A protein has these predicted regions:
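Short, surface-exposed "cap/lid" segments of acyl-processing enzymes
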Residues: 11-76, 205
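Catalytic histidine neighborhood in serine/cysteine hydrolases
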Residues: 62-66, 220, 224-241
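Gly/Ala-rich beta-loop-alpha elbow adjacent to hydrolase catalytic centers
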Residues: 110-114, 118
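Short beta-strand/loop motif that positions the catalytic acidic residue
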Residues: 199, 205-207, 211
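Conserved alpha/beta-hydrolase "acid-adjacent" motif
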Residues: 212-218
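Catalytic active-site module of serine/aspartate enzymes centered on a nucleophile-bearing elbow/loop
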Residues: 236-274
Length: 274
């Protein structure tokens, strides 16, 4: 389901405690950076962030967690249409360096486009681990690759949010998808795929068996081309926005366990993460 309304006056995003940036301070050696998806807000990953924050090291300290609201999100779809992909990258870098000032190790993670940004960061920065939920490296709609040609004449198409199997779950997204922003997402995905061999950190990829937005090829690309250890966890009862779906408790538990391992300086992953 998708929560939509009068996006032009910002009413649907007025609750900053739900849709705005999130910072959960921690004193362990690990900081975690989690990133939301395309046209959505931090609301889609807040429960995931709080679950990860519950991880503890041997001294009982919790990790610090940061969840930024990416440029062009949580306002109007027209504002998203004006953002170059580098604006998203730079916003993520800013939060990465903030965590590096506070913690010895940084774990990056994200949902959908946020997963692509997490991978892009892991290829360029020193990270201790990567957590991905249906990362956007290949889209189900193959026509999306031509968005750069269509955007000058077609500003937007109906929204793509709300791919959740759980009936009472709500994902707050724009009711329109700006094609100019899709074109920028395509650039990000293409560049990220080329950079995958530069990633050496252990990576957990949560992949929904049914995803109407991101192709399952995305997880395969990470597993085949990343230079680090990769574990793919198949989610059998969730659609694209798995952080709000039936399998959320499973991915939260595995993510929390992974962060606890990283806090102890362990870079390996459990043999069976499920």
């Amino acid at each position: 389901m998708s929560s939509r309304g009068d996006w032009h006056n910002g009413a649907m995003f007025s609750d900053q405690q739900r849709h705005g940036p999130l910072h959960l301070p921690g004193t362990s050696s690990v900081g975690v950076l989690l990133l939301h998806g395309f046209t959505a807000t931090t609301a889609s990953v807040r429960d995931w962030a709080h679950a990860v924050h519950e991880a503890t090291d041997d001294a009982g300290a919790h990790p610090g967690v940061r969840v930024p609201l990416l440029p062009g999100h949580g306002t109007r779809w027209e504002e998203l249409a004006e953002q170059p992909w580098q604006a998203w990258r730079d916003a993520v870098d800013e939060q990465y360096w903030a965590l590096r000032r506070e913690h010895e190790h940084v774990v990056v993670g994200g949902l959908s486009m946020g997963g692509a940004l997490a991978l892009h960061t892991a290829a360029r920065r020193e990270v201790s681990g990567v957590l991905l939920v249906n990362p956007a490296l290949s889209l189900v709609n193959r026509m999306a690759r031509f968005s750069h040609l269509a955007s000058p004449v077609v500003a937007s198409l109906p929204g793509i949010g709300g791919d959740v199997k759980k009936e009472d779950a709500l994902e707050s997204t724009y009711d329109r998808t700006p094609l100019a922003a899709v074109a920028q997402l395509n650039v990000l995905m293409h560049r990220t795929v080329r950079m995958l061999p530069a990633i050496t950190a252990p990576t957990v990829v949560f992949r929904s068996e049914v995803d109407h937005i991101v192709s399952g090829d995305s997880a395969d690309l990470v597993a085949e081309h990343s230079s680090g250890e990769v574990r793919v966890v198949d989610l059998q009862n969730s659609y694209h926005v798995a952080t709000l779906d039936h399998d959320a408790p499973l991915l939260e538990r595995i993510s929390r366990d992974a962060v606890q391992r990283f806090s102890r300086g362990e870079r390996f992953l459990p043999e069976d993460p499920s």
